[in-house]
Amino acid sequence: MRLASLVLALLIFGFTGCYHGSKPSSIGTPAPDFTIQDSDRSVTLSQLRGKIIVLNFWATWCPPCVDEMPSLLQMQKKMQGKGITVLAVSVDDDANNYHKFLKDHSIDLVTVREGGTKTDTGVISPVANKYGTSKIPESYIIDRNGTIRRKFIGPVDWKQQEIVEYLSRLQ
């Protein structure tokens, strides 16, 4: 009996001790602030306050993320001049792959590489963890006041009329 209790306690501790994410960010709450220093730029979320932000967590090794990127680019171009900024945060651990991807695909977005660790259960990175994000792609729409308005888990077709209209209404 004593051995069974010990095994049960170790199992419970083991499962709760392995959790590496934070509490997921909720709609209607302030977006957690962060600063990422990439090789050629530093981006702080709060410095973008006053704009509508589409915050996208992605990586070059993530096929759905790569598939989603063209629609993010198209949406950014369509909404240009309307106070909407796409901030793409890469959790790539390999800087060379990241920079090669940006160059090869002519990515013209505000994008920074935080780096991260790919695991069997998702991805670990400090900024993604602030949002409770462990699976990518994951995106947030943040209003001009820094409040999370929408959250998307998985790839999104950012050209959808519903999304474009939603972003237009936030202006």
Where are these regions (language model features)?
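N-terminal targeting signals for export/organelle localization
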Residues: M1-T35, K151, Q161-E165, L170-Q171
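Short pre-active-site segment immediately N-terminal to redox-active cysteine/selenocysteine motifs
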Residues: K51-I53, F57-W61, K135
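Residue-level signal for well-ordered, solvent-exposed loop/turn and beta-edge residues enriched
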Residues: T29, R41-S42, T147
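A short beta-strand-turn-helix
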Residues: D33-I53, Q76
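Short, acidic, Ser/Thr-enriched surface-loop or helix-capping motifs
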Residues: S25, Q37-D38, I142-D143
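Thiol/disulfide oxidoreductase modules built on the thioredoxin-like
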Residues: H105-I107, E114-Y166
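Structural microenvironment flanking redox-active thiols in thiol-disulfide oxidoreductases
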Residues: D67-I107, K118-N129
